[in-house]
């Protein structure tokens, strides 16, 4: 990715200080999603390493991962798999508890969402501590998927999430970084 593109994408993300609590700067990608040129460029850049490769499914983490993941799935001509909060999917699911900053939560996937051996790219808008992505990768692997990559528009490297995912043996692709929380 060119430095100019990284600059443009970073400029298209709104920063909201002291949200959701004092001392946190929330990185709001809805401004990037609302800019057709920035959104297109971000999706094109996310999928670039897999152009021409076999990708069976793209899995997106609720909620912004659905938006980005759907666009990525379209670009790589694959199916899309939603990973949702507990109780939101209508069919039989497998569930995974994952760590939050303070406590735990659960995510789910339909039991038939991926087949053993399918090549899956995991997508979300942002990676911070990596807890949700880690849980999603464990769910996909539980169903027999090969998670070939995890892709995020924004990385908060100070929180260590991308490093955690790489330690699981999953390549991580991020487009832009913001320091701090």
From Swiss-Prot:
<keyword id="KW-0660">Purine salvage</keyword>
<keyword id="KW-0963">Cytoplasm</keyword>
<keyword id="KW-0808">Transferase</keyword>
<comment type="subunit">
    <text>Homodimer.</text>
</comment>
<dbReference type="GO" id="GO:0006166">
    <property type="term" value="P:purine ribonucleoside salvage"/>
</dbReference>
<protein>
    <recommendedName>
        <fullName>Adenine phosphoribosyltransferase</fullName>
        <ecNumber>2.4.2.7</ecNumber>
    </recommendedName>
</protein>
<dbReference type="GO" id="GO:0003999">
    <property type="term" value="F:adenine phosphoribosyltransferase activity"/>
</dbReference>
<dbReference type="InterPro" id="IPR000836">
    <property type="entry name" value="PRibTrfase_dom"/>
</dbReference>
<dbReference type="Pfam" id="PF00156">
    <property type="entry name" value="Pribosyltran"/>
</dbReference>
<dbReference type="GO" id="GO:0016208">
    <property type="term" value="F:AMP binding"/>
</dbReference>
<dbReference type="GO" id="GO:0002055">
    <property type="term" value="F:adenine binding"/>
</dbReference>
<comment type="pathway">
    <text>Purine metabolism; AMP biosynthesis via salvage pathway; AMP from adenine: step 1/1.</text>
</comment>
<dbReference type="InterPro" id="IPR005764">
    <property type="entry name" value="Ade_phspho_trans"/>
</dbReference>
<keyword id="KW-0328">Glycosyltransferase</keyword>
<dbReference type="GO" id="GO:0044209">
    <property type="term" value="P:AMP salvage"/>
</dbReference>
<dbReference type="GO" id="GO:0006168">
    <property type="term" value="P:adenine salvage"/>
</dbReference>
<dbReference type="GO" id="GO:0005737">
    <property type="term" value="C:cytoplasm"/>
</dbReference>
<comment type="function">
    <text>Catalyzes a salvage reaction resulting in the formation of AMP, that is energically less costly than de novo synthesis.</text>
</comment>
<dbReference type="InterPro" id="IPR050054">
    <property type="entry name" value="UPRTase/APRTase"/>
</dbReference>
<dbReference type="InterPro" id="IPR029057">
    <property type="entry name" value="PRTase-like"/>
</dbReference>
<comment type="similarity">
    <text>Belongs to the purine/pyrimidine phosphoribosyltransferase family.</text>
</comment>
């Amino acid at each position: 990715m060119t430095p100019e593109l990284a600059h443009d994408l970073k400029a298209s993300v709104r920063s909201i200080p002291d949200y959701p609590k004092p001392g946190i700067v929330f990185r709001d990608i809805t401004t990037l999603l609302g800019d057709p040129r920035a959104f297109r460029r971000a999706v094109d850049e996310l999928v670039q390493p897999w152009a021409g490769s076999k990708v069976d499914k793209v899995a997106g983490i609720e909620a912004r991962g659905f938006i980005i993941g759907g666009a990525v799935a379209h670009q790589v001509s694959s199916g899309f798999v939603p990973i949702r909060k507990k109780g939101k999917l209508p069919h039989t699911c497998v569930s995974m508890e994952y760590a939050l900053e303070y406590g735990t939560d659960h995510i789910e996937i339909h039991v038939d969402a991926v087949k053993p051996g399918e090549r899956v790219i995991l997508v979300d808008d942002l990676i911070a501590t990596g807890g949700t992505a880690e849980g999603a990768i464990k769910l996909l692997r539980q169903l027999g998927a090969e998670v070939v990559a995890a892709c995020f528009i924004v990385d908060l490297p100070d929180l260590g999430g991308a490093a955690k995912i790489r330690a699981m043996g999953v390549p991580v692709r991020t487009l832009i970084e913001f320091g701090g929380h």
